[in-house]
Amino acid sequence: PDPFAESAALPVKSTASELVQRLGGIAEETSFSGGRGHSAEEGTAYHAFLQYADLGGEAEAELARMRREGLLSEEQFALLDADRLNAILSLPVLRGLRGKRVLREQTFLVQLTAREAGLADTDDRIVFQGAVDLLAETEEGWLLVDYKLSSHSDEQLRRDYAPQIALYKKAVAAAMRVSEHTVRARILN
């Protein structure tokens, strides 16, 4: 057997979604297709709203501001429901971030070993890039929030996206130069 076969099969550079697929998880690009009753376009519209929303705001006021500022397309506005948006904005995880340092659509380019990424039992390095929906600095450390629009249960989402969340936690820890133990993650469905 070739002693370097495992290393030779590893990518040198990859997107986070490609690595998640290699780990057997669900790729980020499909996360908003959500299945029963949720289109990819609908998920993308909610994601865009959350990218620009004031976490302390009311949905109607935020929608009006976003329309004035041209932040969303008319097609996206048509897919959004103000009551649902108010319910999202009132979730404890988002309410708790008011006044905190919040980074949205935070891109990263990090280097991990294949072992750290869970891809192979080798210390060969892999560079990968991706984007975190929301990252907030809290008293306990960094909180990573990943948006999903799905009719699946929270437990099912945790199972389906465990490889992605684990990889993103490692990426945040590496990018922010903190211990991975200080990075928490939440899926917001």
State what each model feature region is:
Residues 1-189:
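Structural signature of nuclease core domains in nucleic-acid processing machines
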